Swiss-Prot record:
Domain of life: Bacteria
UniProt lineage: Bacteria, Bacillati, Actinomycetota, Actinomycetes, Mycobacteriales
Functional summary from the UniProt entry: Toxic component of a type II toxin-antitoxin (TA) system. Upon expression in M.smegmatis inhibits colony formation. Its toxic effect is neutralized by coexpression with cognate antitoxin Rv2654c.
Native source species: Mycobacterium tuberculosis (strain ATCC 25618 / H37Rv)
Alphabetical UniProt keywords: Toxin-antitoxin system
Descriptive protein name: Toxin Rv2653c
Region (Disordered): 1-42
A biological process from GO: negative regulation of growth
Length: 107
């Protein structure tokens, strides 16, 4: 007697409609351009250094910048970061889901 239910759980987690050998986390499920851990670490280091440089520059010139401009600059930095995160996710096959404006509109 096979335990059908427990055997199906990993398949459910990976997405049932994927073919068996091609489920998400398995053999050929990922695109080839997923960065390795070293590449991710290096990219993160570069990002952190860029952020530190930008922050040091902002602190150096902060006495001549009024509050509204500083807030706008910070907001734009956050938006850039979010945009980069979205683009990195879309390379992996993730797509941002847009909620419809009206609740009863058809997607």
């Amino acid at each position: 007697m096979t335990h059908k239910r427990t055997k199906r759980q990993p398949a459910i987690a990976a997405g049932l409609n994927a073919p068996r050998r091609n489920r998400v986390g398995r053999q050929h499920g990922w695109p080839a351009d997923v960065p390795s851990a070293e590449q991710r670490r290096a990219q993160r280091q570069r990002d952190l250094e860029a952020i530190r440089r930008a922050y040091a520059e902002m602190v150096a010139t902060s006495h001549e910048i009024d509050d509204d401009t500083a807030e706008l600059a910070l907001l734009s930095m956050h938006l850039d970061d979010e945009q980069r995160r979205l683009e990195a996710g879309m390379k992996l096959g993730w797509h941002p889901y847009h909620f419809p404006d009206e609740p009863d509109s058809k997607q």
